[in-house]
């Protein structure tokens, strides 16, 4: 696969962990994600994040009532050990 990035950079930052994440994610962890880069995320969590990562990577946005069109916060499906991550589209100056 090529080295050239396609679209915008998308960075995920772990905002909270309730319980113990079996994949080892910790508050403050940052990962770069894309359609071709899972960033070593838990596979189950990445599966849920994928549509949002792709939308941010290729210029889509969220409705105004959600706040910032470049940012979304998501939580994993393990509600006993819930990890919350903020996905952010990085503009050229970030």
Over which residues does each language-model region extend?
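Short, basic/aromatic beta-hairpin or loop at an interaction surface
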Residues: 1-12
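N-terminal first-folded block
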Residues: 10-22
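Short, compositionally biased
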Residues: 43-60
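Short, charged beta-turn/beta-strand-edge "cap" motif at the junction between a beta-strand
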Residues: 17-19, 36-41
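Short, compact, well-ordered microdomains
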Residues: 6, 63-94
């Amino acid at each position: 696969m090529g080295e050239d990035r396609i679209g915008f950079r998308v960075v995920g930052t772990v905002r909270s962990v309730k319980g113990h994440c079996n994949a080892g994610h910790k508050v403050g962890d940052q990962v770069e994600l894309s359609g071709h880069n899972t960033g070593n995320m838990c596979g189950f969590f990445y599966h849920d994040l994928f549509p949002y990562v792709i939308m941010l990577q290729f210029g889509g946005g969220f409705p105004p009532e959600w706040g910032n069109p470049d940012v979304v916060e998501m939580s994993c499906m393990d509600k006993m050990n819930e990890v919350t991550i903020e996905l952010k589209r990085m503009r050229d100056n970030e």
